[in-house]
């Protein structure tokens, strides 16, 4: 089976792409990585948690059920985020990874419930949280309830922080909308993948509202790093070692 690179549009053997961390061997483009593959890249072991919430359609949005079922089939996941507990470099941690193939990781009530529950579990068990974001923002099919997830998850992250515990975020392409306006930017350390798009509204919308002409790359990870919005850009194949080092330092601090 072959897949098409999002940048060079060349057909690539899917197995080869997976082995190369979804990085195109022809042009170097970082293609969007499913949550399960990212977990395989990062962890030695991982136990899924908070995976039992049922589908809800709170405002009876037309065709939402059909789109939801299609997203489940396409992604192989039950929702737009996978949460659980695992080890990275032998360090025990809680992890959430958003799923790009499930409605582009959009935030609905189940996504908010899962991430909130993970933070609460991590706070109770005094564990750090590693979060990978990829999101188009709030899920419009759930109306105002999707926007409420921003405050709910942010409050849980704040309680985790108040307990003196570590939260590291890796923003991946794209991290936009309500995710950027809440938990994606609350990490003690915020890293990103090369070339990731990070922002709230799209470039065209911002230009229309402000009346200004903006640089083409103003929402790129490189622009954000240059202007102090994130802390580091880490190549995908180096992230496991990078996070393991941070977790090891934090473990020494907590136990001291």
From Swiss-Prot:
Zinc fingers typed C4-type, residue spans: 5-27
Gene3D superfamilies per record: 2-enoyl-CoA Hydratase, Chain A, domain 1
One GO term describing the cellular component: acetyl-CoA carboxylase complex
UniProt: Zn(2+) binding residues: 5, 8, 24, 27
Enzyme class, UniProt record, top EC level: transferase
InterPro entries: AcCoA_carboxyl_beta, Acetyl_CoA_COase_Trfase_b_su, ClpP/crotonase-like_dom_sf, COA_CT_N, Znf-ACC
Keyword set includes Transmembrane helix: no
EC number: 2.1.3.15
Similarity comment text for this entry: Belongs to the AccD/PCCB family.
Record note on quaternary structure: Acetyl-CoA carboxylase is a heterohexamer composed of biotin carboxyl carrier protein (AccB), biotin carboxylase (AccC) and two subunits each of ACCase subunit alpha (AccA) and ACCase subunit beta (AccD).
Name by which UniProt lists this protein: Acetyl-coenzyme A carboxylase carboxyl transferase subunit beta 2
Lineage: Bacteria, Bacillati, Bacillota, Clostridia, Lachnospirales
Gene: accD2
